[in-house]
């Protein structure tokens, strides 16, 4: 798989995590919260993988994805308190 596709995967996984966290925090359903946590973990894993392959040109994109993922992680943590 090309790096371009891997970067697209980062963005898709972050967006999926955002949606799942949104649904889970509205419903507070245990399974949805678990699924949202899994989606965050998958997005984080893909993001960390791509950081090792990134060039300076990729940094802005990765920083944006990191910020969005961190925000959604915080949203999920707050919902679970």
Where do the protein language model's features map onto the residues?
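A structural signal for well-ordered alpha-helices, especially hydrophobic packing surfaces
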Residues: 18-25, 44-47, 51, 69, ...
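Charged low-complexity stretches with an acidic bias
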Residues: 3, 7-10, 57-81
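Short amphipathic alpha-helical heptad-repeat segments
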Residues: 9-13, 35-44
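Acidic (E/D-rich), amphipathic helical modules within compact regulatory domains
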Residues: 49, 54, 64
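N-terminal acidic leader/helix
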Residues: 2-31
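Short, charged, amphipathic alpha-helical segments
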Residues: 30-41, 59-68
């Amino acid at each position: 798989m090309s790096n371009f596709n891997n970067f697209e995967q980062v963005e898709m996984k972050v967006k999926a995590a955002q949606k799942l966290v949104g649904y889970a925090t509205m419903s507070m359903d245990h399974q949805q919260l678990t699924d949202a946590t899994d989606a965050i973990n998958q997005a984080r894993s893909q993001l960390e993988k791509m950081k090792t392959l990134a060039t300076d040109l990729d940094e802005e994109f990765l920083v944006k994805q990191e910020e969005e993922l961190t925000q959604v992680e915080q949203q999920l943590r707050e919902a679970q308190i």
